[in-house]
């Protein structure tokens, strides 16, 4: 997304009850179960969800205390927490099968370390991070508000608010914003599709959703009434995994920057932090956010690449999109290597990733979230490198 001129830009989000997000949630529940038992566990868990059936598959290495039965019960608890107790998909009677098996010894050889020697990356790949001064969380505005709308609906639904009592867990949102001189100034259209009880009034649903959107968007940003689309296809009773099959890792743009920045292609959920698809993408966001928070630029895109079995990144690329404040991008790339150890081990230690902190990342975006000091989560959203970055450029 460019940073100059007048244009429209759109991003979408999906709720925790979307089939693909149900799969992501279960995969991260499996991951957290292993990391809670042993922080050095290796996990690559894929999940398929469909009508009253859940299938777990992938590779793991961890303590035997994490039994298939425990993982199945964890998946069932996740479905219950999301809110599914429907004829076609219920936490009570969904058939859950686990086909998880041991991690490949060939992969383990390239990844494992000897003592304190840096281990190699779990795979080759490219990862991106991004930050922009458009919102208080330094996230792109269209995605920020698309997430915010669904998160607000979720909070109201789980709080038992009568206005949304007819709504069920599956939902999607899409927000189009108008930019003037490269800055967002208002919404031109908002789309929300949400699963609901049979017989629910579409007029009541529209009214409830309009109230949510107006609460989430800044004052004066609401789109014209004829560009507000609430359940535009009409009835949406059959939803969730009963309506569409869900798979882990199919919402990578929703998970990251809503299309406002490049994506390396690797999904996050179900992967332990030796997988640089996840951990290095978190590091890229962390560094990009700190660059913008330090006042070195208004926008920052960062790319890092790795090779399997090699500990150091093969490249670090920085693009400030013309918004740098007298900052040389090549020098900034070198400085970023200095302020953070970008080996897989270094990233995990710096961001404290070998902990069961992933379940809550599985919906409403991995980035732009608020760290909770008590739980020490979302560490990649902290801005604790600001002083070091300013010092490197004599600010």
Swiss-Prot record:
It comes from Gluconacetobacter diazotrophicus (strain ATCC 49037 / DSM 5601 / CCUG 37298 / CIP 103539 / LMG 7603 / PAl5). The gene is metK. GO terms for cellular component: cytoplasm. Catalyzes the formation of S-adenosylmethionine (AdoMet) from methionine and ATP. The overall synthetic reaction is composed of two sequential steps, AdoMet formation and the subsequent tripolyphosphate hydrolysis which occurs prior to release of AdoMet from the enzyme. Mg(2+) binds at residue 20. It catalyses: L-methionine + ATP + H2O = S-adenosyl-L-methionine + phosphate + diphosphate. Residues 103-113 are annotated as: Flexible loop. PANTHER family: S-ADENOSYLMETHIONINE SYNTHETASE. Its cofactor is Mg(2+); K(+). The keyword Ligase does not apply. It is found in: Cytoplasm. This is S-adenosylmethionine synthase.
């Amino acid at each position: 997304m460019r940073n100059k001129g007048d244009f429209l830009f759109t991003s979408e989000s999906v709720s925790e009850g979307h089939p693909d997000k149900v799969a992501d949630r279960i995969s991260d529940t499996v991951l957290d179960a292993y990391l809670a038992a042993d922080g050095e566990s290796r996990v690559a868990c894929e999940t398929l969800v469909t009508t009253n059936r859940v299938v777990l598959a992938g590779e793991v290495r961890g303590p035997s205390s994490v039994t298939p039965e425990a993982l199945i019960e964890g998946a069932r608890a996740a479905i219950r927490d999301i809110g599914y107790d429907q004829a076609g998909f219920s936490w009570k009677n969904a058939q859950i099968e686990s086909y998880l098996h041991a991690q490949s010894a060939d992969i383990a050889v390239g990844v494992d370390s000897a003592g304190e020697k840096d281990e190699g990356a779990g795979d080759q790949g490219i990862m991106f991070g991004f930050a922009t001064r458009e919102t208080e969380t330094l996230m792109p505005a269209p995605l920020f508000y698309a997430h915010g709308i669904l998160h607000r609906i979720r909070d109201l639904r789980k709080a038992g608010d009568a206005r949304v009592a007819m709504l069920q867990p599956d939902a999607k949102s899409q927000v189009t914003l108008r930019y003037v001189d490269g800055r967002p100034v208002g919404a031109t259209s908002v789309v929300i599709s949400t699963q609901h009880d049979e017989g629910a009034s579409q007029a009541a649903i529209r009214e409830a959703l309009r109230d949510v959107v107006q609460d989430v968007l800044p004052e004066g940003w609401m789109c014209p009434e004829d560009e507000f689309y609430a359940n535009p296809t009409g009835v949406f009773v059959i939803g969730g995994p009963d309506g569409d099959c869900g798979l882990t890792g199919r919402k990578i743009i929703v998970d990251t920057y809503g299309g406002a920045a490049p994506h390396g292609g690797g999904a996050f959920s179900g992967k332990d932090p030796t997988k640089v698809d996840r951990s290095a993408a978190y590091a890229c966001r962390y560094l990009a956010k700190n660059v913008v928070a330090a006042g070195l630029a208004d926008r920052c895109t960062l790319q890092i690449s790795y090779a399997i079995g090699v500990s150091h990144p093969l490249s670090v690329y920085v693009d400030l999109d013309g918004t740098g404040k007298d900052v040389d991008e090549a020098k900034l790339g070198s400085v970023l290597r200095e302020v953070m150890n970008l080996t897989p081990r270094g990233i995990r230690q710096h961001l404290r990733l070998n902990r069961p902190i992933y379940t809550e990342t599985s919906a409403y975006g991995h980035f732009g979230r608020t760290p909770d000091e008590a739980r020490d989560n979302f560490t990649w959203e902290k801005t604790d490198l600001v002083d070091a970055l300013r010092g490197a450029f004599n600010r």
